[in-house]
Amino acid sequence: MVTGELKSKIDNLWELFWTGGLTNPLDVIEQMTYLMFIRDLDDADNVHAKEAAMLGLPYKSIFAGEIQIGDRKIDGSQLKWSTFHDFPAAKMYSTMQEWVFPFIKNLHGDKESAYSKYMGDAIFKVPTPLMLDKIVTTMDAIYEQMEQIKSADTRGDVYEYLLSKLATAGVNGQFRTPRHIIRMMVEMMDPKADEIICDPACGTSGFLVAASEYLRDRKKQEVLFDRQNKEHYMNHMFHGYDMDRTMLRIGAMNMMTHGVENPYIEYRDSLSDQNTDKEKYSLILANPPFKGSLDYDIVSADLLKVCKTKKTELLFLALFIRMLKIGGRCACIVPDGVLFGSSTAHKAIRKALVEENRLEAVISMPSGVFKPYAGVSTAILIFTKTGHGGTDKVWFYDMKADGFSLDDKRTETKENDIPDIIERFRNLDKETDRKRTDQSFFVPKEEIAENGYDLSINKYKEIEYVPVEYPSTQEIMTELHEIEMKIGEEMQALEELLGLN
């Protein structure tokens, strides 16, 4: 988490953009992202050069010699952050605008890397030399502070903090699934080193980043020290799709700042015929758009066969089933209406999950989880694609607290069910004897089917009413008489004190 002096410096950097005339938070994030990458490029090049020297291996810097930019050849060292950050403001500005930006836009000539795809149409928007000079100085101070912290997570935390400002500013708040909820879902799914992971509505790539961090932290030896697994992790494991190009660029950069070199983040309308993915992924993690409505003619025909509806939350569930391999797993967030909606489409998608696949868990979340951006009640569905059923019983959990207050302030609290949810889900064999009055319990498939495939926890949860015992009428009347006598005695004492008798 970003706190103290580092947080203050990032806020100052944001303020520099804001007061300088860049008032669209998406533009600010984009420009910061580009500048972070330009600085990182210099740092990474220096690290690689030192490593090569220590090992006695040859190394050619990407800044070595003369570099062709347009119709001119430039001394490559001038493109290094460590060189141009000492230039006078006007020279630094012209260097950045005329040389550095064109250089990084064409850095990967293969056009297939995530970097080249999202930098290809990058535009330098810092309006004045003086503003750029202040930004570069502030960024140097931020990086110096990050080095003092000496934590592998700091880079990612800084970027997450920047992304949180999108939501704070009221822009694209719908893309912000709370980080602790994302992490809980990833922990429950426990990704493996050979997964192919997808988020078909990825936004800023929060789920993909969390999955990559989980693998780095929990399975580092297996993922990063095995050549084949590392190549898969860096280039083939993570797939994300979205319809907002700016969010795609930010999402791709988010992945790269968290150490994934070449994520497959692409512009795509996941629900349309444009998306032909079928039985491709082993794990889907998603929080698809709620309450959207689409025309039938732009929705993929095979999704409408599963449930004929215009509701995006139902269509995305049908899509997840189609995109998963047999044996593939999904953890996704849905609005409560998906669980109990009475329309034909609602029932059809729930039936498909229960009867044609293996629905494993329904975690009901309190309505304040998405505050202050939305007060909608939601749940997490976890299922495995089988294509032939397999649901025996479904595990339900009633989350009452997520570690934060459920009002608009969302301040940290001690009440937190998340560790308990993860622990219980990982030990489902110990859950079989729980009663319907407990916070979690199993419900047999037959009972769910009898109830129209209703998946709302309140349909099955039993509330234990503890009878309240009241004193007898005689006891109450006796107590009232005693109170009355005491009042009379005290009134008499007061009158004597005041000399009224």
Predicted regions and their residues:
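Short acidic (Asp/Glu) and glycine-rich catalytic loops that position anionic groups and cofactors
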Residues: 11, 137, 231, 261-265, ...
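Conserved Class I SAM-dependent methyltransferase catalytic core
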Residues: 28, 32, 243-250, 265, ...
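Hydrophobic alpha-helical scaffolding
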Residues: 148, 201, 240-244, 283, ...
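DNA target-recognition domains and sequence-specific DNA-contacting regions of bacterial/archaeal
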Residues: 281-287, 293, 321, 463, ...
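C-terminal, active-site-flanking charged/polar segments
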Residues: 358-359, 371-421
